[in-house]
A protein has these predicted regions:
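Glycine-rich phosphate/diphosphate-binding loop of Rossmann-like nucleotide-binding domains
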Residues: 1-33
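N-terminal low-complexity segments that are often proline-rich with Ser/Thr-Pro
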Residues: 133-166
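Glycine-rich phosphate-binding loop
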Residues: 41-79
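Short, ordered loop/turn segments at secondary-structure junctions
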Residues: 4, 29-31, 58-59, 80-83, ...
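C-terminal binding/interaction regions
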Residues: 4-8, 85-145
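Short glycine/serine/threonine-rich phosphate/pyrophosphate-binding segments
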Residues: 6-11, 34-38, 57-66, 85-87, ...
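N-terminal beta-loop-helix "entrance" segment that forms/cooperates
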Residues: 26-48
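Structural motif
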Residues: 25, 51-53, 73-77, 99-104, ...
Length: 166
C-alpha cells in the first residue's frame, strides 16, 4: 500500500486472501516518500517467494507502475478513492507506458476484493490442466460462474467455445 490510510479498503483484499488460505505480506511504502524501500522490497520479492504483487495507491498512484518497473512478477494495481473519487488514481494506474504492465482493478473496496481474486487466479494458472478443475484455492464455480452466464452474454456466442471454462 502506498499509505497506511489505504488499509481500511485493503482489508477487504486481506480478508479475501485469508478466506482462500493464501499467504501474503503487507507492506506500506510510498513510491514518492519511500522510493528506496519500495525498490528494495520489490527487488527481493521473488527471493521471499512472492509470485504476484498487489499494489494499492491513491491520487498520483505511482506505486503499481514503480513496482512493475522493478519486477517481472504480475502486478495488480488497486486505485484508492481521493478528492476526485479515485478517477485520478484509476487513470494513473491504467495508463502505464509500454513495457510496464499493470493489471488495473476498479476503485476502492470492489477493486481490493477483485485484486485478491485475480491474484488467486494467477496463482492457480499452473494448476489448470485441460478439462480438469483447479486444485485447491477457489472452486470452479467461484472462478467462472456469473449470474448472466446462462444466457445472453456475448461470451456465450464466441466462435471457439473450447477456450471457455465449463
Amino acid at each position: 500500500m502506498g499509505s497506511a490510510s489505504d488499509s481500511e479498503v485493503m482489508n477487504h483484499c486481506v480478508e479475501t486472501l485469508q478466506e482462500h488460505d493464501i499467504d501474503f505480506d503487507i507492506v506500506v511504502a510510498s513510491a514518492h516518500r519511500d522510493p528506496d524501500k519500495v525498490r528494495d522490497w520489490v527487488l527481493n520479492a521473488k527471493q521471499r517467494g512472492n509470485r504476484v504483487i498487489i499494489a494499492a495507491a491513491g491520487m498520483a498512484a505511482a506505486l503499481p507502475g514503480v513496482v512493475a518497473a522493478y519486477t517481472d512478477l504480475p502486478v495488480i494495481g488497486v486505485p484508492m478513492k481521493s478528492d476526485l473519487n479515485g478517477l485520478d488514481s484509476l487513470l494513473s494506474i491504467s495508463q502505464m507506458p509500454r513495457g510496464v504492465p499493470v493489471a488495473c482493478m476498479s476503485i476502492g473496496k470492489h477493486g481490493a476484493v477483485n485484486a485478491a481474486l485475480f491474484a488467486i487466479r494467477i496463482l492457480l494458472v499452473n494448476e489448470y490442466k485441460k478439462d480438469e478443475k483447479p486444485q485447491g484455492g477457489l472452486q470452479q464455480r467461484d472462478l467462472f460462474e456469473h449470474p448472466w452466464k446462462k444466457g445472453g452474454h456475448p461470451w456465450n456466442q464466441v466462435r471457439n467455445p473450447r477456450h471457455l471454462p465449463r
